[in-house]
Amino acid sequence: MKTIFFKEHEAPRSWYLIDAAGKPLGRVAAKTAAMLRGKHKVSFAPHQEIGDYVVIINAEKVAVTGNKAKDKMYYTHSGYVGGLKSINFNGLIAKKPAEPLMIAIKGMLPKGPLGRKLLTNVKVYAGPEHPHQAQNPIAVEV
């Protein structure tokens, strides 16, 4: 029996809403990455973009356990000598509330063109408001 593959533009897609308030950072990111890839669908294929769209709200209230709020560091490099910059979790949340979640999700997606395309299907918002009411997102518990 042959395996049936969806064409990427014909694959049925849904919109999901995840409230990250008080939820662990890694669990929210793992659930989101799986939904973006489409691993919850029977038609999953690792080389296709057939996943769903995910809207995450309250990203600024995402939880980390232990001392990670002050000990977890995020590094960026400008490319110049001595251009390494570091900031801890609390500092990054204060500066860019959605960034820790985006970094965690990006790390859980495939590297390369497919992963970059999948990352465009997630929308992360710091507060409880989002502009995707018209898509009627389905609320998902993490």
Curated annotation (Swiss-Prot):
Signal peptide: none annotated. InterPro entries: Ribosomal_uL13, Ribosomal_uL13_bac-type, Ribosomal_uL13_CS, Ribosomal_uL13_sf. SUPFAM superfamilies: Ribosomal protein L13 (SSF52161). Keywords: Ribonucleoprotein, Ribosomal protein. GO terms for biological process: negative regulation of translation; translation. GO terms for cellular component: cytosolic large ribosomal subunit. GO terms for molecular function: mRNA binding; structural constituent of ribosome. It comes from the Bacteria. The keyword rRNA processing does not apply. Part of the 50S ribosomal subunit. This protein is one of the early assembly proteins of the 50S ribosomal subunit, although it is not seen to bind rRNA by itself. It is important during the early stages of 50S assembly. Belongs to the universal ribosomal protein uL13 family. HAMAP family: Ribosomal_uL13 (MF_01366). This is Large ribosomal subunit protein uL13. It comes from Treponema denticola (strain ATCC 35405 / DSM 14222 / CIP 103919 / JCM 8153 / KCTC 15104).
